[in-house]
């Protein structure tokens, strides 16, 4: 994945993996891990990638998972998965489609930033 396709926001202002894992679904798992290493994430080996043949369209996809519920925004290929029991506040994520109780976890601010970070490979 070309650097110009990946870098849209400085990641050094927060620790992305402190409370969550990011799943970057590009054309290959290798591209995903290479991208995360380039972005300076502390534990790129913790990140999983999946081959997505539809990833020719630029954009970002967000999926927030809490328990057995999930929300998604079908506009690209970045996944966010919360590791803890707190549920997602849809007002923070700007998503609709399921009922979640409010959470004060600040990592949801990171999710907003992720939406501007990655575009899929051509």
Swiss-Prot record:
Induction: Expression is up-regulated during nitrogen starvation. Part of the gene cluster that mediates the biosynthesis of elsinochromes, pigments consisting of at least four interconvertible tautomers (A, B, C and D) that have a core phenolic quinone to which various side chains are attached and which play an important role in fungal pathogenesis. The non-reducing polyketide synthase PKS1 was proposed to iteratively catalyze decarboxylation between acetyl-CoA and malonyl-CoA subunits for polyketide chain elongation. This is Elsinochromes biosynthesis cluster protein HP4. It comes from Elsinoe fawcettii (Citrus scab fungus).
